[in-house]
């Protein structure tokens, strides 16, 4: 199986993502020919580049085959958030997003960065879906009426 773009799998030291030479902008998906479709924006943070491939494929399939909706998607490999320019772009993307997805965020300093950006936007976001990650990041989950935030008893 071949990867369609070398930047998606290139590895090496010292690049913008520490473990990858790709940039978040290289993975951004913007739908062509939106027409009358409703566009929603998704931002995700995953541990490694292979995890982002399925999210990118899903977005492309939605954009190609759904008559009523289209997806704009911005993706980040967790380690890319160490780079200040990437982190600032991540903040901007989350501020404009409808949905945030996070997976395998287990590095404390990076988990803290994700929380610092997503938490202030949580109530505005339509959904926040985080799975196996640090507890503070898991508490951001919000899908419909489901939330992992503990409410004070009445």
Regions found by a protein language model. Give the residues of each.
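An N-terminal assembly and electron-transfer interface module characteristic of large anaerobic redox
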Residues: 2-154
């Amino acid at each position: 199986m071949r990867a369609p773009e070398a930047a998606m799998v290139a590895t090496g030291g010292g690049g913008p993502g520490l473990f990858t030479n790709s940039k978040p902008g290289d993975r951004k998906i913007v739908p062509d020919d939106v027409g009358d479709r409703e566009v929603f924006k998704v931002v995700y943070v995953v541990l490694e580049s292979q995890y982002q491939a399925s999210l990118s494929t899903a977005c492309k399939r939605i954009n190609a085959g759904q008559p009523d909706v289209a997806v704009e998607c911005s993706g980040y490999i967790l380690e890319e958030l160490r780079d200040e320019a990437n982190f600032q772009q991540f903040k901007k993307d989350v501020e404009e997003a409808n949905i945030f997805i996070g997976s395998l965020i287990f590095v404390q300093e990076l988990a803290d960065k994700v929380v610092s950006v997503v938490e202030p936007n949580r109530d505005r976001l339509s959904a926040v879906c985080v799975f196996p990650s640090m507890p503070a990041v898991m508490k951001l989950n919000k899908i419909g009426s489901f939330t992992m935030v503990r409410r004070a008893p009445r």
